[in-house]
Amino acid sequence: MSDFSGSGWLAEIFLRYELKRGVTRLTDKQHIGPLMVQRPFYPEQGIAHTYLLHPPGGVVGGDKLLINIDVQPHAHALLTTPGATKFYRSAGGVARQVQTLTVAPNGFLEWLPQENIFFPEAQVRLETHVRIASSSKFISWEIQCLGRPVLNEQFDNGDIRGRLQFYIDDKLTLAESIFIEGSQKQSAVMREFPMVGSLYIYPASDELKAELHESLAVFFSTEVRPLEYGLTDVDGILVLRLLGSQTEPMMACFAHIWQATRQYWLGYCPEPPRIWAT
C-alpha cells in the first residue's frame, strides 16, 4: 500500500481474485480509508460479483483514491459501484483517482462502475492503467458527467484531466487523454453534450464488431433520447464512444452492449446487476 501526505484523505484498495475449485474467490483484500468492498456474491455460476463502495461524502480537492484490481489466471470477476462517484468543488487542491486493472493470462475482468459527476469548480485528475495478457478478456466503461444536467447546472471554472493507458502483453496498445477546462464541453470533444462515455472490449474480432453494430441498431431503433455514438477497432480493442445528456440512456446502451458481448463470448445473456436499477 502507498504512503500519502497531503491536505485531503487517502483511500486505497487492493483486490486479488483467484480461481479455486471452479469458483473465483477474493483471496486478498487490503484497504486504507473509506474505500472498501462488500463480500463477493455469485448470481452467475463461478463469477465473483463485487460492489466497490466509494466514500459516501464524495471527493474534494486534496483527496486521493487508489484502486488496484488483480485478476489471476482463469479467474472471472465483475466489479461495479452502487452509485455515482461525486467530485465536489475544490478550495484549491486537486482530487486524484488512479485505477490499475491487471488481468493475467486467461483471466476475465469486467470493470463497470457507475458515472463520475464533476461539480462546478472541481479540480480532478483521473488515471486508468490497464495491463492484460493477449489471452485475457476485458470489458470496462467510464461515464463522465460535467455538472448536473438534470438541474440545468453547467460545469464552470473547473479543470478535469484524464488519461488512459492500455497495455497488452506489456505493450502500450491504446493511450487516450481528455482535458476539460471551465465550460469547454462546447469543444469538438463534447459537441455541446455534458456527458461522455467510453466502453472498452478486448479481444476484438470482425464477427464481434458486426454483432455489436447490430445490437446498437436494435438499441437506437427504440431509444428516443439524444445520444451520439461511434464504434471503432483500435489495434484489437473495440471502443464504443457515447455523447449524451442523461445517465440512464448511456448506462442502458452500455449494458445492452455488455450483454451482447457476454452472449457472444459465453453463450448466454446475463442479467444486469440489480444495483443499477436502484
UniProtKB/Swiss-Prot annotation:
Induction: The probable operon is induced by urea. Its main location: cytoplasm. It is found in: Cytoplasm. The keyword Nucleotidyltransferase does not apply. InterPro entries: UreD (IPR002669). GO terms for cellular component: cytoplasm. Keywords: Chaperone, Cytoplasm, Nickel insertion, Plasmid. Disulfide bonds: none annotated. One of its GO terms (molecular function) is nickel cation binding. It holds the Pfam family UreD. Belongs to the UreD family. UreD, UreF and UreG form a complex that acts as a GTP-hydrolysis-dependent molecular chaperone, activating the urease apoprotein by helping to assemble the nickel containing metallocenter of UreC. The UreE protein probably delivers the nickel. PANTHER family: UREASE ACCESSORY PROTEIN D. Required for maturation of urease via the functional incorporation of the urease nickel metallocenter. This is Urease accessory protein UreD. The lineage of its organism: Bacteria, Pseudomonadati, Pseudomonadota, Gammaproteobacteria, Enterobacterales.
